[in-house]
Regions:
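Serine-dependent protease modules
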Residues: 20-237
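Hydrophobic helical h-region of N-terminal Sec-dependent signal peptides
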Residues: 7-11
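N-terminal signal peptide c-region/cleavage motif recognized by signal peptidases
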Residues: 13-16
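Positively charged n-region of N-terminal signal peptides that target proteins for export
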Residues: 1-5
Length: 237
């Protein structure tokens, strides 16, 4: 009987020691860190600076004879250059980049800056205004970091997700959250058709075209729009 008792005590101590090794022993061990993931993925997310020529908006006053003379200046009819700020994601080593159509679709000049400060000119290969997507080609690019794609069919609500982009032009930032919803319609956000993934990771102006990635660094989707009353999700300190 004593042998069985000793064996039980020894087994219990061994199990207890193993469990103690698995249980976090300090706050530092409990803390979740995305540092390795960000180091791996962030270099494939780029900042996009685009120049768009826009025509002055028509005003109903121009049809009024009294005000017509004030609008006869030919210079007022000329298109004006506007700067568009956004983000993009490198999909291949030779410089294929995906972004939003509203960032680059009507641009006359596109400049792409990588996280390591390398800079490239870019041209639009394909554009889809309905789904707000555009494919770019970086001129003379090679051996670039890029993100692998993940099929949307395997994405589940509740998964951790990171949003990487250039909000407000402050430089590349990373925010975290979860996948909050799937198969959202773009009509609610005024972006037309399409399949949209909803996340609670803070996304702000300038994040458009940036990456939403999973914990393995795979691309879940492209940050496209925000439903907000304040104009942003903030999360910028």
């Amino acid at each position: 009987m004593m042998k069985y008792f000793v064996f039980f005590v020894a087994l219990w101590c061994a199990v207890g020691a193993a469990a103690q090794q698995q249980v976090p022993q300090s706050a530092a061990q409990v803390q979740l860190s995305f540092v390795p993931l960000v180091r791996q993925s962030a270099p494939a997310v780029v900042n996009i600076y685009a120049k768009i020529m826009s025509k002055p908006q028509a005003t109903p006053l121009r049809s009024d004879p009294f005000f017509e003379r004030f609008f006869r200046n030919p210079g007022m009819e000329k298109p004006r250059a506007q700067n568009s700020l956004g983000s993009g994601v490198i999909l291949s080593a030779d410089g294929i980049v995906v972004s939003n159509f509203h960032v680059v679709g009507m641009a006359t000049d596109i400049r792409v800056v990588l996280a390591d400060r390398r800079e490239y000119s870019a041209r639009v290969l394909l554009g889809d205004a309905d789904n707000d997507l555009a494919i770019l080609q970086l001129e003379g690019a090679e051996d670039l970091p890029y993100l692998p794609l993940r099929g949307s069919d395997s994405v589940e609500v509740g998964e951790l997700a990171l949003a990487i982009g250039n909000p407000f032009g402050v430089g590349q930032t990373v925010t975290s959250g979860i996948v909050s919803g799937l198969a959202r319609s773009g009509a609610a956000a005024g972006t037309g058709r399409g399949y949209f993934i909803q996340t609670d990771a803070p996304i702000n102006p300038g994040n458009s075209g940036g990456a939403l990635i999973d914990v393995e660094g795979r691309l879940l989707g492209i940050n496209t729009s925000i439903l907000t009353r304040s104009g942003g999700s903030n999360g910028i300190g």
